[in-house]
Amino acid sequence: MASEKSYKTVPVTGKNLAMIYHHMGNKTQSLEEAYKQLEKELGETQAPPPSPQSSLDGEPLSEGELEEISEEEEEEGEAPPPIPAKKRQRKNPSKAPAAKAPSK
C-alpha cells in the first residue's frame, strides 16, 4: 500500500519567496540578503497602476470619459447574477437502475 504525501499550502509572502529564492539560488547568501534582493527586483519590475484620471497612453481624460468610467464602475458594483444550481448527472446513463416489473 503506497502512502500518499499530503502537501500543506503556504501563503505566498515575501519571506516565503525569499526562502525559495535562497534555496534555489545562491546558498552563500543569507535569507535576509535574499529577501532584500527579491524586494529590490520586484520593486523594479512592478509598475505603478495607472491613475483613473489618465488614459492608457498617458493623455488626460475628458469629463465625458471620466463620467463613463464612473458609471461603468457603479454598474459593476451591483449584485452579481445568481449562480444556477448544478444539475445532478449520472456517471454512466447506460447503468441506470432498471424498472422492476410488478409482481403478480
Curated annotation (Swiss-Prot):
Q: Where is this region: Disordered?
A: 35-104
Instruction: Output compositional bias ranges, type Low complexity.
Output: 94-104
User: Acidic residues compositional bias: what residue ranges?
Assistant: 60-78
Protein name in the entry: Putative protein 22K
